[in-house]
Amino acid sequence: GETETARFGCRKFEIDPQKGFILNGRSYPLRGVSRHQDRKGAGVAITKEMMEEDMALILEMGANTIRLAHYQHAQAFYDLCDEKGVVIWAEIPYITMHMHNGRANTLTQMEELIVQNYNHPCIAVWGLSNEITAASAVNEELLENHRALNDLAHKLDPTRPTTMANVFMLEITSPILEIPDVNSYNLYFGWYLGELDQNDDFFDTYHAKYPDRCIGFSEYGADANPAYQSARPERGDWSESYQAVYHEHMLKMWSERPYIWAMHVGI
């Protein structure tokens, strides 16, 4: 007969609307990156050595969580995350625009993601979609698709919560935010638009209005060229100097708000 083996690990975690991420009964603030499985010259067909290099860089910067954006990643990388103790957000490629005839495909993607990966202890949450309202109206069809995905995820894996990454334009009163177990937002105040303090204001406003909901920071960042330095860094100058100002602000903002359950730098 055939034999199938699978590694597994035991851990307990919860996401609290006031205390954030809790691992094995202790506060464990999640700070990390959003990773794409992609390399110049290799595309998505990256080697195990490339995966190990990615992981080494991520750990060197002090990260303890990775959002695997925005699709299924290689089993070898999930294994690596198990070995290194990195907390994972895994999600399906349901991105930016809802397609009228795409419902069945999203459900298949979710089923395959969970069935193939549920034994990996590194995975903490299943992601339903990414910035799906960027080019789609919040209508009943969109809501129903997310309800179906949410129900399927709970049916296949009742041990893990669901989440989704919401685009910054989505109003915090939107009914789609009521569907997943925990929420998260992609915000780029201080880079693409606005000022850095608007990130602080957003989370303060959200938490004040919905103190019993869990909220995370699923994407943020500022592009830079290391060759560009400035004595007077400002938004949009592409300098490494401004990028440093940006990330220093974000880390301070996050450290003062323990309820933010995770932060993932957009890469």
Question: Which functions belong to the PLM regions below?
Answer:
Residues 131-132, 168-170:
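Short, internal active-site loops enriched in acidic
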Residues 122-126, 144-167, 173-267:
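Substrate-binding clefts and catalytic carboxylate motifs of secreted carbohydrate-active enzymes
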